[in-house]
Amino acid sequence: MTMFNKIVKEFQWGQHKVRLETGEIARQASGAVIVDVEDTVVLATVVGARTAKPGQDFFPLTVDYLEKTYAAGKIPGGFFRREGRPSEGETLISRLIDRPLRPLFPEGFYNEVQVVIHVLSLNPEIPADIPALIGASAALAVSGLPFNGPVGAARVAYINNEYVLNPTRPQMKESALDLIVAGTERAVLMVESEAQQLSEEVMLGGVVFGHEQMQIAIDAIHDLVREGGKPEWDWQPAAKNEPLIARVTELAQADLLAAYQLRDKQARSAKLKEIYAATSAKLEEDAAAGGTVAADKATVGNVLFDIEAKIVRTQILNGEPRIDGRDTRTVRPIEIRTGVLPRTHGSALFTRGETQALVVATLGTKGDEQNIDALEGEYRERFMLHYNMPPFATGETGRVGSPKRREIGHGRLAKRALAACLPSADEFGYSIRVVSEITESNGSSSMASVCGGCLALMDAGVPMKAHVAGIAMGLILEGNKFAVLTDILGDEDHLGDMDFKVAGTEQGVTALQMDIKIQGITREIMQVALAQAKEGRLHILGKMTSAVSGANTVLSDYAPRMITIKINPEKIRDVIGKGGSVIRALTEETGTTIDISDDGVVTIASTSSEGMAEAKKRIENITLEVEVGQVYEGTVLKLLDFGAIVNILPGKDGLLHISEIANERIKDINDYLKDGQQVKVKVIQTDEKGRVRLSAKALLNDAANGAPQGEPTPQQ
């Protein structure tokens, strides 16, 4: 007899066997599920508060994805030898899980919900993000919380013109597409992808393929809930306060309509604040006059927001101008300036309407690459992109400091968009960091970062394969009527049913991100939306190409120059020296940065061409191979009874036997040589142990016979 009511469901999913378990671990959580995909094991837990906090006016959902180093058989680094703050990868996966779950909680549900996913075991070939998303969905489904799921998820690759479900890491290296799609049985809710300039048709096909394949996982979660699910919560949304809605509509609708005729964001925002304050004040007067308690500001704010949404959505669906006066297909005015900052390696100021990004590109050496100690193994990242949005960008005050989750997510999206068009390390040996400083924001700042990032890279002299532009799109759906909005504003993002961002070149898409709030978006609607996004992207690409036709052919004076030479890998230790003494002296004395790879490729970088040339010369001298028959200018290091030790190259000495000094017999070597004397010698023999025999006599004989002696190689 066991104390556990353990429920297990197993299913074959593509090339992987998946196991779902509940009822044994974390039984005090509202819901807990273990997902095992070929030895990648995650524990997903959900805890929901039974009541909402008083005055709560938003849904407080938090998702934390945590990787434990023991999962990969490792001990954490650092002084304390324990996991610290979440890595960038953990933050991104937390966001990935949050995005499809959040829209499935019912409107008005304000109870605090926390989803925590622990990675307990990791097969390096099976990424943990999809198991984590499936686990979070299953844990919510078995918890009984009001949740309109379950959600399924799948990763889709595109290899040899075929879609592949949940590929392994080795397969991903061959794929032209890395696409994650999540959704319910009926609809896609979230897409996150990176692609090698693929067509819109291929991208949409990947979304549809992933949605079809995730149904297997959704069915398994339903089976798990039937046997191991907890009773559903008896939660009902609060009844709508119809008298309050009618009164707020009467007080504010006309003013809100007028406010949305103001095309300037700051003026419109100021007017809306006035309306909110005036409406609340009037309701308080009504309550005081009637001897009742006025509705709290949060409730009034929600009613006003619903009225705003209805006004904006109705206007757009009726074909009226959008908030800023544009039609649905027009991109805001664009201004481009490059070379903005005098001392940076590359810079661009990209302005689209009231959204502006100041983007800076910096070139570095191999030593500047980011070393990432991920759970699946260490690797180096050559290209970095960081996105910052300070509060002044929206005319507000706020905290300034370490990047928030949103900034990390936007930076990763922009990085994915540009990565496909970067030159390879063989073509362009620099490490690259792009920083996007958002100086104004009214929608689509991540896509402004893509455009500005491409321009800054070209200004820095990075030979991009093509111009890359990004555009943010919106969609409004009411019944059978829908409208796709090109280049959305911040307000349109909040009031719409879908926002998606597409980045790419003239040839195709490099990144696609979708977030869908409702379940009525069909394949046909997505097809129309992607076609309209392409039209907008090509318009922006035309503006960018007119401003900057291609990458600068000359690097900034302040960017490091770089040369590479190849040495014998066995000579690497000679260049490094004992404890790094030789390479340290080289870098300090020549003012260069020197990187040596295991295959013997030496990269020398510096802003000084003279320093680079000096470092190259010294490394070549250190790594010169002793050749039989070659003549060297050596230095006598030590005199022996039977000859002398002569240094002919750095770190390479040879024996000049007494019989090889002169043609005549020598009684006392001191009559011919002295310590420190420069002597011209010829290599006559080397052996497998690296010992070198030298001769001065051979040169005398060569001279007597008229044989060419060659130029001596001087020692460093």
From Swiss-Prot:
Annotated GO biological process: mRNA catabolic process; RNA processing
Domain S1 motif as annotated: residue spans: 629-697
Subcellular location: Cytoplasm
Source organism superkingdom: Bacteria
PROSITE patterns found in the cross-reference section: KH_TYPE_1 (PS50084), S1 (PS50126)
Cofactors (names): Mg(2+)
EC number: 2.7.7.8
Domain KH: 560-619
GO molecular function: 3'-5'-RNA exonuclease activity; magnesium ion binding; polyribonucleotide nucleotidyltransferase activity; RNA binding
Reaction catalysed by this enzyme: RNA(n+1) + phosphate = RNA(n) + a ribonucleoside 5'-diphosphate
Keywords, ordered alphabetically: Cytoplasm, Magnesium, Metal-binding, Nucleotidyltransferase, RNA-binding, Transferase
Database matches in InterPro entries: ExoRNase_PH_dom1, ExoRNase_PH_dom2, ExoRNase_PH_dom2_sf, KH_dom, KH_dom_type_1, KH_dom_type_1_sf, NA-bd_OB-fold, PNPase
GO cellular component: cytosol
Predominant location category: cytoplasm
UniProt xrefs under Gene3D superfamilies: GHMP Kinase, N-terminal domain, K Homology domain, type 1, Nucleic acid-binding proteins
Residues annotated for Mg(2+) binding in this entry: 493, 499
NCBIfam families reported in the protein's UniProt record: polynuc_phos, PRK11824.1
Protein family membership: Belongs to the polyribonucleotide nucleotidyltransferase family.
Role description: Involved in mRNA degradation. Catalyzes the phosphorolysis of single-stranded polyribonucleotides processively in the 3'- to 5'-direction.
Name of the protein in its database record: Polyribonucleotide nucleotidyltransferase
